[in-house]
Amino acid sequence: MRAVLISGSYKGLSIPKEIIQFINKYIKSNKVISFIASDFEDYEGNKKFVNKLVDLFKEQSITFKKVYIIDSLKTKPETHSNLKESNLVFLLGGDTLKQIEYINKFSLKELIKKEDKIVLGISAGAINLGTKVVLAKDESDNIPELSMYEGIGVTNINVEPHCEFRNQKHFKELEEASLYSPILLMNDDCFIIVENDKYSYYGSYIILDKKNTYFNNKECTLEDFLSEIKYD
């Protein structure tokens, strides 16, 4: 399986060169991409976000033969046809629970994780690439309670993209969630490249496991981590 999990924010709004090199390594030409929305009814928002991402790829000399947006403007058979044709699939950010609901409704999981594709997920999309997703309560992000569900099954890790480390209320919810599964808390600069079960980590992150925090494979306090990465 080949995948990229992206936290969701980059200074200067550029796609890291490691991600570009990874894509070009496996798909040298005739790139066809399907963008999977988080809100299948937000047609204008989806189009705007996709156009921005296509421009960012173009700045890095990646162009696409075809670009598809997977949302409710298309029938279920049309979404399946688009995904079968695509060698790149990009799950957009937004409402995490709403996105997995639509993915299940349109029966997209098996098509997303075909071995011949590179799958990218940003923010909510990165979360939903997991196998057994454990999602901490976050009412500000439309997650009213701790949620556990079957993800798409592309990766075997749980992530918390662009984590607000100094939000003590939400961090306590993350600690509770970590009792059920380790969670990788991603800073804005963090992304993960998955290549045939090998995970390569870029940027700064910590692991939260049973309320304990780990940085560079060593147990640490949250403040030690924030001091190390100069978190503002």
Please identify what each model-predicted range represents:
Residues 14-78, 82:
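ATP/NTP phosphate-donor binding region
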Residues 65, 69-118:
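Flexible gly/pro-rich beta->alpha loop and the following alpha-helix that scaffold active-site loops
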Residues 2-28, 40, 44-51, 135-232:
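C-terminal and late-domain segments of enzyme folds
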Residues 31, 87, 156:
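Conserved acidic residues
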